[in-house]
Amino acid sequence: MRETYYEQIDERVFETELNNGLKLFIIPKKGFQKTFVTYTTKFGSLDNKFKPYGSDTFVTVPDGVAHFLEHKLFENDDTGEDLFTAFAEDNAQVNAFTSFDRTSYLFSATDHVERNIIRLLTMVESPYFTQETVDKEKGIIAEEIKMYQEQPGYKLMFNTLKAMYDTHPIRVDIAGSVESIYEITKDDLYLCYETFYHPSNMVLFVVGDVDVAHIYDVIATHEAQRDKEAQPQIVRDPLVEKETVNEAKVSETMKLQSPRLMLGFKNKPLTDEPNATFVKRDLEMTLFYEMLFGEETDFYQSLLNEDLIDETFGYQFVLEPTYSFSVITSATQYPDKLKEVLLSEIEKYQGNLTDVEAFDLLKKQFIGEFISGLNSPEYIANQYTKLYFEGVSLFDLLDIVESITLESVNETSRACLNLAQVVDSRLEMK
Protein backbone atom coordinates (compact mmCIF):
# COMPACT_ATOMS: atom_id res chain seq x y z
CA MET A 1 0.00 0.00 0.00
CA ARG A 2 1.13 3.54 -0.71
CA GLU A 3 1.54 5.69 2.41
CA THR A 4 1.04 9.45 2.46
CA TYR A 5 1.93 11.46 5.56
CA TYR A 6 0.30 14.86 6.15
CA GLU A 7 2.68 16.54 8.57
CA GLN A 8 0.56 19.62 9.25
CA ILE A 9 -2.26 17.54 10.76
CA ASP A 10 -0.21 14.44 11.67
CA GLU A 11 -2.34 12.01 9.65
CA ARG A 12 -1.33 8.99 7.57
CA VAL A 13 -3.31 7.53 4.69
CA PHE A 14 -2.62 4.10 3.24
CA GLU A 15 -4.13 3.45 -0.17
CA THR A 16 -4.03 0.89 -2.94
CA GLU A 17 -5.98 -0.39 -5.91
CA LEU A 18 -6.67 -4.11 -5.83
CA ASN A 19 -6.38 -6.28 -8.94
CA ASN A 20 -10.13 -6.15 -9.50
CA GLY A 21 -10.13 -2.33 -9.52
CA LEU A 22 -11.39 -1.69 -5.98
CA LYS A 23 -9.81 1.36 -4.33
CA LEU A 24 -8.93 0.78 -0.68
CA PHE A 25 -8.07 3.50 1.86
CA ILE A 26 -7.05 2.85 5.48
CA ILE A 27 -6.42 5.57 8.07
CA PRO A 28 -5.07 4.26 11.39
CA LYS A 29 -6.26 6.29 14.41
CA LYS A 30 -4.41 5.13 17.51
CA GLY A 31 -6.57 5.09 20.64
CA PHE A 32 -9.92 5.45 18.84
CA GLN A 33 -12.61 3.23 20.36
CA LYS A 34 -14.74 3.05 17.22
CA THR A 35 -13.81 1.91 13.75
CA PHE A 36 -15.84 3.32 10.88
CA VAL A 37 -16.07 1.61 7.49
CA THR A 38 -17.75 2.82 4.29
CA TYR A 39 -18.21 0.85 1.08
CA THR A 40 -19.27 3.27 -1.63
CA THR A 41 -20.22 3.09 -5.29
CA LYS A 42 -20.24 6.10 -7.56
CA PHE A 43 -23.88 5.47 -8.40
CA GLY A 44 -26.60 7.89 -7.41
CA SER A 45 -30.00 9.08 -8.54
CA LEU A 46 -28.50 11.09 -11.42
CA ASP A 47 -27.16 7.95 -13.09
CA ASN A 48 -30.27 6.80 -14.92
CA LYS A 49 -28.78 6.85 -18.45
CA PHE A 50 -25.50 5.04 -19.16
CA LYS A 51 -23.70 2.46 -21.28
CA PRO A 52 -23.45 -0.95 -19.58
CA TYR A 53 -20.04 -2.65 -19.69
CA GLY A 54 -19.51 -4.21 -23.11
CA SER A 55 -22.20 -2.10 -24.81
CA ASP A 56 -21.97 0.94 -27.11
CA THR A 57 -25.62 1.83 -26.58
CA PHE A 58 -27.08 4.04 -23.86
CA VAL A 59 -29.82 2.53 -21.73
CA THR A 60 -32.28 4.43 -19.55
CA VAL A 61 -33.61 3.00 -16.29
CA PRO A 62 -36.53 4.27 -14.18
CA ASP A 63 -35.95 7.05 -11.66
CA GLY A 64 -35.16 5.77 -8.18
CA VAL A 65 -33.20 2.64 -9.16
CA ALA A 66 -30.08 3.55 -7.13
CA HIS A 67 -32.11 4.02 -3.94
CA PHE A 68 -34.17 0.88 -4.67
CA LEU A 69 -30.97 -1.14 -5.08
CA GLU A 70 -29.68 0.14 -1.74
CA HIS A 71 -32.82 -1.21 -0.06
CA LYS A 72 -32.57 -4.60 -1.74
CA LEU A 73 -28.93 -5.25 -0.89
CA PHE A 74 -29.90 -5.57 2.76
CA GLU A 75 -31.66 -8.76 1.63
CA ASN A 76 -28.65 -10.39 0.04
CA ASP A 77 -29.82 -14.00 0.04
CA ASP A 78 -32.87 -16.20 0.41
CA THR A 79 -32.18 -17.19 4.03
CA GLY A 80 -34.11 -14.29 5.49
CA GLU A 81 -31.23 -13.30 7.79
CA ASP A 82 -31.77 -9.98 9.56
CA LEU A 83 -28.51 -8.21 8.76
CA PHE A 84 -29.17 -5.36 11.19
CA THR A 85 -29.35 -7.91 14.02
CA ALA A 86 -26.28 -9.77 12.75
CA PHE A 87 -24.19 -6.59 12.82
CA ALA A 88 -25.59 -5.58 16.22
CA GLU A 89 -24.62 -8.95 17.71
CA ASP A 90 -21.04 -8.16 16.68
CA ASN A 91 -21.15 -4.69 18.31
CA ALA A 92 -21.70 -2.81 15.05
CA GLN A 93 -24.34 -0.41 13.77
CA VAL A 94 -24.96 -0.67 10.04
CA ASN A 95 -26.65 1.81 7.71
CA ALA A 96 -26.71 3.03 4.13
CA PHE A 97 -27.68 6.10 2.11
CA THR A 98 -28.19 7.12 -1.50
CA SER A 99 -27.45 10.64 -2.72
CA PHE A 100 -27.50 12.28 -6.14
CA ASP A 101 -24.06 10.90 -7.02
CA ARG A 102 -23.24 7.91 -4.78
CA THR A 103 -24.55 5.07 -2.64
CA SER A 104 -22.72 4.21 0.57
CA TYR A 105 -22.98 1.23 2.92
CA LEU A 106 -21.39 1.77 6.30
CA PHE A 107 -20.96 0.59 9.84
CA SER A 108 -19.34 1.70 13.07
CA ALA A 109 -18.01 -0.97 15.41
CA THR A 110 -16.32 -1.22 18.78
CA ASP A 111 -15.35 -4.87 18.31
CA HIS A 112 -15.10 -7.70 15.73
CA VAL A 113 -13.97 -5.24 13.05
CA GLU A 114 -12.61 -7.92 10.72
CA ARG A 115 -15.81 -9.98 10.88
CA ASN A 116 -17.98 -6.92 10.31
CA ILE A 117 -15.92 -5.86 7.29
CA ILE A 118 -16.37 -9.28 5.70
CA ARG A 119 -20.10 -9.18 6.48
CA LEU A 120 -20.44 -5.73 4.87
CA LEU A 121 -18.49 -6.79 1.77
CA THR A 122 -20.48 -10.00 1.45
CA MET A 123 -23.77 -8.15 1.82
CA VAL A 124 -22.99 -5.62 -0.90
CA GLU A 125 -21.35 -8.16 -3.21
CA SER A 126 -24.15 -10.77 -3.09
CA PRO A 127 -27.22 -9.43 -4.90
CA TYR A 128 -30.34 -11.55 -4.72
CA PHE A 129 -33.45 -10.28 -6.51
CA THR A 130 -36.64 -12.00 -7.59
CA GLN A 131 -39.54 -10.21 -9.21
CA GLU A 132 -41.64 -11.17 -6.18
CA THR A 133 -39.26 -9.54 -3.66
CA VAL A 134 -38.83 -6.52 -5.95
CA ASP A 135 -42.60 -6.03 -6.19
CA LYS A 136 -42.92 -6.36 -2.41
CA GLU A 137 -40.33 -3.60 -1.90
CA LYS A 138 -42.23 -1.19 -4.17
CA GLY A 139 -44.99 -0.71 -1.62
CA ILE A 140 -42.47 -0.01 1.14
CA ILE A 141 -40.58 2.59 -0.91
CA ALA A 142 -43.82 4.17 -2.16
CA GLU A 143 -44.80 4.84 1.47
CA GLU A 144 -41.34 6.29 2.12
CA ILE A 145 -41.73 8.65 -0.85
CA LYS A 146 -45.18 9.77 0.36
CA MET A 147 -43.77 10.39 3.84
CA TYR A 148 -41.03 12.64 2.44
CA GLN A 149 -43.58 14.52 0.35
CA GLU A 150 -45.38 15.47 3.57
CA GLN A 151 -42.27 17.20 4.96
CA PRO A 152 -42.41 20.93 4.10
CA GLY A 153 -38.64 21.40 3.74
CA TYR A 154 -38.27 18.40 1.44
CA LYS A 155 -41.32 19.36 -0.60
CA LEU A 156 -40.12 22.93 -1.01
CA MET A 157 -36.63 21.85 -2.07
CA PHE A 158 -37.76 19.56 -4.86
CA ASN A 159 -40.43 22.01 -6.03
CA THR A 160 -37.59 24.52 -6.37
CA LEU A 161 -35.31 22.09 -8.22
CA LYS A 162 -38.11 21.15 -10.62
CA ALA A 163 -38.66 24.83 -11.31
CA MET A 164 -34.92 25.40 -11.87
CA TYR A 165 -34.17 22.42 -14.09
CA ASP A 166 -35.93 21.35 -17.28
CA THR A 167 -34.36 17.95 -18.09
CA HIS A 168 -31.51 17.39 -15.61
CA PRO A 169 -32.31 14.46 -13.24
CA ILE A 170 -31.40 16.66 -10.24
CA ARG A 171 -35.06 17.75 -10.48
CA VAL A 172 -36.23 14.25 -9.50
CA ASP A 173 -36.50 12.94 -5.93
CA ILE A 174 -33.57 10.65 -5.08
CA ALA A 175 -36.07 7.85 -4.33
CA GLY A 176 -37.89 8.47 -7.62
CA SER A 177 -41.66 8.85 -7.82
CA VAL A 178 -44.37 6.39 -6.88
CA GLU A 179 -44.98 5.93 -10.61
CA SER A 180 -41.32 5.38 -11.54
CA ILE A 181 -40.55 2.79 -8.87
CA TYR A 182 -43.46 0.64 -10.02
CA GLU A 183 -41.68 0.42 -13.40
CA ILE A 184 -38.53 -1.09 -11.85
CA THR A 185 -37.85 -4.76 -12.61
CA LYS A 186 -35.33 -7.22 -11.24
CA ASP A 187 -33.55 -6.99 -14.62
CA ASP A 188 -33.13 -3.22 -14.11
CA LEU A 189 -31.58 -3.90 -10.70
CA TYR A 190 -29.20 -6.55 -12.00
CA LEU A 191 -28.17 -4.34 -14.95
CA CYS A 192 -27.37 -1.41 -12.65
CA TYR A 193 -25.67 -3.68 -10.15
CA GLU A 194 -23.38 -5.30 -12.74
CA THR A 195 -22.46 -1.87 -14.11
CA PHE A 196 -22.11 0.36 -11.06
CA TYR A 197 -21.25 -2.16 -8.34
CA HIS A 198 -18.20 -3.38 -10.20
CA PRO A 199 -15.10 -2.98 -7.96
CA SER A 200 -13.62 -0.49 -10.46
CA ASN A 201 -16.44 1.93 -9.58
CA MET A 202 -16.19 1.47 -5.81
CA VAL A 203 -14.18 2.69 -2.82
CA LEU A 204 -13.69 0.96 0.53
CA PHE A 205 -12.64 3.17 3.43
CA VAL A 206 -11.52 2.02 6.90
CA VAL A 207 -10.67 4.45 9.71
CA GLY A 208 -9.93 3.49 13.30
CA ASP A 209 -7.42 1.84 15.62
CA VAL A 210 -6.59 -0.98 13.20
CA ASP A 211 -3.55 -2.95 12.05
CA VAL A 212 -3.16 -1.67 8.49
CA ALA A 213 -1.31 -4.71 7.12
CA HIS A 214 -3.76 -7.17 8.66
CA ILE A 215 -6.87 -5.32 7.44
CA TYR A 216 -5.35 -5.10 3.97
CA ASP A 217 -4.68 -8.85 3.93
CA VAL A 218 -8.23 -9.65 5.06
CA ILE A 219 -9.79 -7.45 2.37
CA ALA A 220 -7.38 -8.43 -0.42
CA THR A 221 -7.91 -12.15 0.27
CA HIS A 222 -11.68 -11.72 0.22
CA GLU A 223 -11.68 -9.68 -2.98
CA ALA A 224 -9.32 -12.09 -4.79
CA GLN A 225 -12.05 -14.74 -4.56
CA ARG A 226 -14.51 -12.68 -6.62
CA ASP A 227 -12.97 -13.35 -10.05
CA LYS A 228 -13.42 -9.75 -11.21
CA GLU A 229 -11.10 -7.78 -13.48
CA ALA A 230 -10.59 -4.01 -13.50
CA GLN A 231 -12.87 -2.18 -15.95
CA PRO A 232 -12.68 1.23 -17.66
CA GLN A 233 -14.69 4.19 -16.44
CA ILE A 234 -18.44 3.97 -16.96
CA VAL A 235 -19.84 6.14 -19.76
CA ARG A 236 -22.69 8.24 -18.39
CA ASP A 237 -25.11 10.55 -20.15
CA PRO A 238 -23.47 14.02 -20.40
CA LEU A 239 -26.57 15.71 -18.87
CA VAL A 240 -26.88 18.85 -20.98
CA GLU A 241 -29.15 21.47 -19.41
CA LYS A 242 -30.23 24.93 -20.54
CA GLU A 243 -28.96 27.96 -18.59
CA THR A 244 -32.38 29.51 -17.91
CA VAL A 245 -34.76 28.40 -15.18
CA ASN A 246 -37.69 26.20 -16.10
CA GLU A 247 -40.25 28.28 -14.16
CA ALA A 248 -39.59 31.58 -12.40
CA LYS A 249 -42.33 31.17 -9.80
CA VAL A 250 -44.01 28.11 -8.29
CA SER A 251 -46.41 27.71 -5.40
CA GLU A 252 -48.21 24.87 -3.64
CA THR A 253 -50.56 24.67 -0.67
CA MET A 254 -50.20 22.22 2.21
CA LYS A 255 -50.93 22.02 5.94
CA LEU A 256 -48.48 24.43 7.56
CA GLN A 257 -48.14 26.60 10.64
CA SER A 258 -46.56 29.35 8.54
CA PRO A 259 -45.97 29.99 4.81
CA ARG A 260 -42.51 29.16 3.44
CA LEU A 261 -40.31 30.86 0.88
CA MET A 262 -37.31 29.47 -0.98
CA LEU A 263 -35.25 31.47 -3.45
CA GLY A 264 -33.28 29.29 -5.84
CA PHE A 265 -30.44 30.54 -8.04
CA LYS A 266 -29.53 28.41 -11.05
CA ASN A 267 -25.78 28.77 -11.61
CA LYS A 268 -23.35 27.55 -14.25
CA PRO A 269 -21.61 24.31 -13.15
CA LEU A 270 -18.10 25.45 -14.29
CA THR A 271 -17.21 22.01 -15.62
CA ASP A 272 -13.86 23.03 -17.13
CA GLU A 273 -12.10 23.91 -13.86
CA PRO A 274 -9.45 21.72 -12.14
CA ASN A 275 -10.62 19.59 -9.20
CA ALA A 276 -8.87 21.62 -6.49
CA THR A 277 -10.23 24.88 -7.92
CA PHE A 278 -13.66 23.31 -8.05
CA VAL A 279 -13.57 22.51 -4.32
CA LYS A 280 -12.08 25.93 -3.55
CA ARG A 281 -14.95 27.66 -5.36
CA ASP A 282 -17.43 25.66 -3.30
CA LEU A 283 -15.75 26.71 -0.05
CA GLU A 284 -15.53 30.34 -1.16
CA MET A 285 -19.27 30.49 -1.84
CA THR A 286 -19.95 28.94 1.56
CA LEU A 287 -17.86 31.69 3.15
CA PHE A 288 -19.66 34.31 1.04
CA TYR A 289 -23.06 33.22 2.33
CA GLU A 290 -21.79 32.98 5.90
CA MET A 291 -20.56 36.58 5.71
CA LEU A 292 -23.95 37.71 4.43
CA PHE A 293 -26.41 35.57 6.37
CA GLY A 294 -24.53 33.93 9.27
CA GLU A 295 -26.13 34.07 12.71
CA GLU A 296 -23.47 36.52 13.92
CA THR A 297 -24.24 39.11 11.23
CA ASP A 298 -26.23 42.29 11.79
CA PHE A 299 -28.34 41.44 8.73
CA TYR A 300 -29.44 38.11 10.19
CA GLN A 301 -30.36 39.78 13.49
CA SER A 302 -32.37 42.43 11.65
CA LEU A 303 -34.33 39.72 9.80
CA LEU A 304 -35.17 38.12 13.16
CA ASN A 305 -36.05 41.42 14.81
CA GLU A 306 -38.43 42.31 11.96
CA ASP A 307 -40.07 38.85 12.14
CA LEU A 308 -39.12 38.16 8.52
CA ILE A 309 -37.53 34.79 9.39
CA ASP A 310 -37.53 32.20 12.16
CA GLU A 311 -35.35 29.26 13.18
CA THR A 312 -36.05 27.51 9.85
CA PHE A 313 -33.89 30.09 8.01
CA GLY A 314 -31.10 28.44 6.05
CA TYR A 315 -28.97 28.67 2.92
CA GLN A 316 -26.88 26.35 0.80
CA PHE A 317 -24.55 26.51 -2.18
CA VAL A 318 -24.02 23.42 -4.35
CA LEU A 319 -21.37 23.06 -7.06
CA GLU A 320 -21.11 19.73 -8.87
CA PRO A 321 -19.72 18.72 -12.28
CA THR A 322 -23.07 18.92 -14.12
CA TYR A 323 -25.11 21.35 -12.01
CA SER A 324 -24.85 24.21 -9.55
CA PHE A 325 -27.43 26.07 -7.52
CA SER A 326 -27.96 28.15 -4.38
CA VAL A 327 -31.01 28.23 -2.14
CA ILE A 328 -32.11 30.52 0.68
CA THR A 329 -35.21 29.62 2.66
CA SER A 330 -37.34 30.36 5.71
CA ALA A 331 -40.83 30.12 7.07
CA THR A 332 -42.20 33.67 6.95
CA GLN A 333 -45.43 35.63 7.18
CA TYR A 334 -43.95 38.20 4.81
CA PRO A 335 -42.52 36.33 1.78
CA ASP A 336 -42.59 39.31 -0.58
CA LYS A 337 -40.69 41.55 1.85
CA LEU A 338 -38.20 38.78 2.69
CA LYS A 339 -37.53 38.14 -0.99
CA GLU A 340 -36.93 41.85 -1.56
CA VAL A 341 -34.40 42.29 1.25
CA LEU A 342 -32.54 39.05 0.48
CA LEU A 343 -32.07 39.92 -3.18
CA SER A 344 -31.06 43.46 -2.25
CA GLU A 345 -28.41 42.20 0.20
CA ILE A 346 -26.92 39.77 -2.32
CA GLU A 347 -26.85 42.37 -5.10
CA LYS A 348 -25.18 44.84 -2.72
CA TYR A 349 -22.35 42.52 -1.66
CA GLN A 350 -21.82 40.20 -4.62
CA GLY A 351 -18.17 40.84 -5.46
CA ASN A 352 -18.05 43.69 -2.93
CA LEU A 353 -17.25 42.21 0.50
CA THR A 354 -14.77 44.39 2.43
CA ASP A 355 -14.81 43.21 6.07
CA VAL A 356 -11.40 41.53 6.33
CA GLU A 357 -11.72 41.01 10.09
CA ALA A 358 -15.01 39.10 9.76
CA PHE A 359 -13.57 37.05 6.90
CA ASP A 360 -10.44 36.10 8.86
CA LEU A 361 -12.57 35.06 11.85
CA LEU A 362 -14.81 32.87 9.68
CA LYS A 363 -11.78 31.22 8.11
CA LYS A 364 -10.34 30.42 11.53
CA GLN A 365 -13.68 28.97 12.62
CA PHE A 366 -13.81 26.78 9.53
CA ILE A 367 -10.26 25.52 10.11
CA GLY A 368 -11.11 24.82 13.77
CA GLU A 369 -14.19 22.81 12.77
CA PHE A 370 -12.12 20.87 10.23
CA ILE A 371 -9.45 19.99 12.81
CA SER A 372 -12.18 19.00 15.28
CA GLY A 373 -13.77 16.78 12.61
CA LEU A 374 -10.57 14.76 12.40
CA ASN A 375 -11.48 13.34 15.82
CA SER A 376 -14.54 11.68 14.26
CA PRO A 377 -13.94 8.53 12.20
CA GLU A 378 -17.41 8.97 10.67
CA TYR A 379 -16.56 12.50 9.49
CA ILE A 380 -13.24 11.38 8.03
CA ALA A 381 -14.68 8.37 6.18
CA ASN A 382 -17.70 10.17 4.71
CA GLN A 383 -15.90 13.37 3.74
CA TYR A 384 -12.82 11.59 2.40
CA THR A 385 -15.00 9.42 0.16
CA LYS A 386 -17.06 12.38 -1.08
CA LEU A 387 -13.97 14.42 -1.92
CA TYR A 388 -12.19 11.41 -3.45
CA PHE A 389 -14.92 11.21 -6.08
CA GLU A 390 -14.31 14.92 -6.72
CA GLY A 391 -10.59 14.28 -7.22
CA VAL A 392 -9.33 15.87 -3.99
CA SER A 393 -7.96 14.46 -0.72
CA LEU A 394 -9.73 15.48 2.49
CA PHE A 395 -6.35 16.16 4.06
CA ASP A 396 -5.52 18.67 1.30
CA LEU A 397 -8.56 20.70 2.35
CA LEU A 398 -6.61 22.68 4.93
CA ASP A 399 -4.20 23.99 2.28
CA ILE A 400 -7.12 24.86 0.02
CA VAL A 401 -8.87 26.81 2.79
CA GLU A 402 -5.69 28.67 3.72
CA SER A 403 -5.28 29.76 0.09
CA ILE A 404 -8.67 31.50 0.10
CA THR A 405 -8.65 35.30 0.35
CA LEU A 406 -11.41 37.88 0.59
CA GLU A 407 -10.57 38.87 -2.98
CA SER A 408 -11.00 35.29 -4.20
CA VAL A 409 -14.36 35.06 -2.40
CA ASN A 410 -15.49 38.23 -4.17
CA GLU A 411 -14.31 36.92 -7.54
CA THR A 412 -16.04 33.58 -7.04
CA SER A 413 -19.31 35.20 -5.93
CA ARG A 414 -19.32 37.07 -9.24
CA ALA A 415 -18.49 33.95 -11.27
CA CYS A 416 -20.65 31.39 -9.48
CA LEU A 417 -23.84 33.18 -8.47
CA ASN A 418 -26.29 33.93 -11.28
CA LEU A 419 -28.81 36.50 -10.06
CA ALA A 420 -30.48 36.60 -13.48
CA GLN A 421 -31.87 33.08 -13.05
CA VAL A 422 -33.94 33.03 -9.86
CA VAL A 423 -36.82 30.80 -8.81
CA ASP A 424 -39.41 32.06 -6.33
CA SER A 425 -40.77 28.89 -4.71
CA ARG A 426 -43.46 28.99 -2.02
CA LEU A 427 -45.55 26.78 0.20
CA GLU A 428 -48.82 28.43 1.20
CA MET A 429 -51.08 27.47 4.11
CA LYS A 430 -54.21 25.47 3.38
Q: Which residues are covered by each model-predicted region?
A:
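A structural supersecondary motif
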Residues: M262-E273, Y289-A331
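N- or domain-start disorder-to-order transition segments that initiate the globular core
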Residues: M1-T35
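Acidic/histidine-enriched segments that form metal/cofactor-coordinating
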Residues: D77-L191, D310, S344, V356-N382
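C-terminal structural cap/anchor segments
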Residues: Y315-Q365
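C-terminal regions of mature proteins
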Residues: E3-Y5, V203-G208, Y349, L361-K430
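An aromatic/glycine/proline-enriched structural segment found at the starts
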Residues: F14, V203-L261, F265-P269
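M16/MPP (pitrilysin/insulinase) zinc-metallopeptidase core fold and M16-derived inactive scaffolds
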Residues: Y39-A109, L292-I309
